C-alpha cells in the first residue's frame, strides 16, 4: 500500500461510519444538529437531540474485529478530547444549561450489506 493510502481509506471508512450512525439515529427519531464539530481541543462526530437531551456522539468504525471492538478505541484520553469539544460547542451556542450525555456508536463493517451497529448510551461522563 503506498504511503498515505491507509489514512485515506481510514478517512473514507470513518465518513461511511458517521453517515451510517447519523441515519441510524434519525431512524430512532433523534434530530441531527451538527456533525464533525472541531475545536482546538478535540472533535465531536455528531451532535443530536434525543427529546430534551443533547447527545454528543462518538462514532468508531472498523472493517475487522482484528483490532478489537470499535468502542474500546474511545480511551480516557479520547473522552477528554470529546468533552473539551462538547464544552466548546455548548459555549459557542450559549447552551451551558442543557441536559446532555455522551454516547458511542460502534460500527463493524464485515460486509458492505450488513454493518453491525452497537449504540452505547451514556457511554462516559464529562471528562477533564
Curated annotation (Swiss-Prot):
CDD domains: PoNe_Nuclease. GO terms for molecular function: nucleic acid binding. Belongs to the UPF0102 family. This is UPF0102 protein GSU0650. It comes from Geobacter sulfurreducens (strain ATCC 51573 / DSM 12127 / PCA).
Amino acid at each position: 500500500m503506498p504511503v498515505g493510502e491507509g489514512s485515506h481509506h481510514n478517512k473514507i471508512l470513518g465518513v461511511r461510519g458517521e453517515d451510517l450512525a447519523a441515519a441510524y439515529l434519525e431512524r430512532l427519531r433523534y434530530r441531527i444538529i451538527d456533525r464533525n464539530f472541531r475545536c482546538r481541543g478535540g472533535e465531536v462526530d455528531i451532535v443530536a437531540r434525543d427529546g430534551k437531551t443533547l447527545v454528543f456522539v462518538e462514532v468508531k468504525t472498523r472493517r475487522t474485529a482484528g483490532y478489537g471492538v470499535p468502542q474500546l478505541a474511545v480511551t480516557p484520553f479520547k473522552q477528554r478530547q470529546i468533552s473539551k469539544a462538547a464544552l466548546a460547542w455548548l459555549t459557542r451556542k450559549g447552551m451551558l444549561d442543557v441536559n446532555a450525555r455522551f454516547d458511542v456508536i460502534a460500527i463493524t463493517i464485515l460486509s458492505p450489506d450488513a454493518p453491525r451497529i452497537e449504540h452505547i448510551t451514556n457511554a462516559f461522563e464529562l471528562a477533564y
